[in-house]
């Protein structure tokens, strides 16, 4: 095995060793990630010199720092408690409201024609 082969083995061991040290694989929650909110976490990839994203398994309990709790499903934390905001289980039917009370309309009395005064009656005769 030449120098290239040896380097490949060492790099592979370093990569797998760093991933194994953090137990980085989809579907698991490493002990180092117990306080991680949501359903994903990142592990350093020494080979690519970047962070790789991993996801907790379906059914894994998840939480947000706001205090909301849920269950992981396809890499997303689906909330199981109601925080007061909308979520996929909320029904968007508005709360019933009372019908405003209508004021009773006063019935208008028909005005009787004014009676002519005695003076006016005498003039017309």
Swiss-Prot record:
GO terms for molecular function: toxin activity. Induction: Induced in salivary glands by blood feeding. GO terms for cellular component: extracellular region. Keywords: Blood coagulation cascade inhibiting toxin, Glycoprotein, Hemostasis impairing toxin, Secreted, Signal, Toxin. Pfam families: TSGP1. Glycans are attached at residues 26, 81, 87. Residues 75-125 are annotated as: Disordered. Residues 75-86 have a biased composition (Polar residues). Its main location: secreted. Salivary gland (at protein level). Saliva (at protein level). It is found in: Secreted. Residues 101-118 have a biased composition (Basic residues). InterPro entries: Ixonnexin-like (IPR011694). Residues 91-125 are annotated as: Responsible for anticoagulant activity. Belongs to the salp14 family. This is Anticoagulant salivary protein 14.
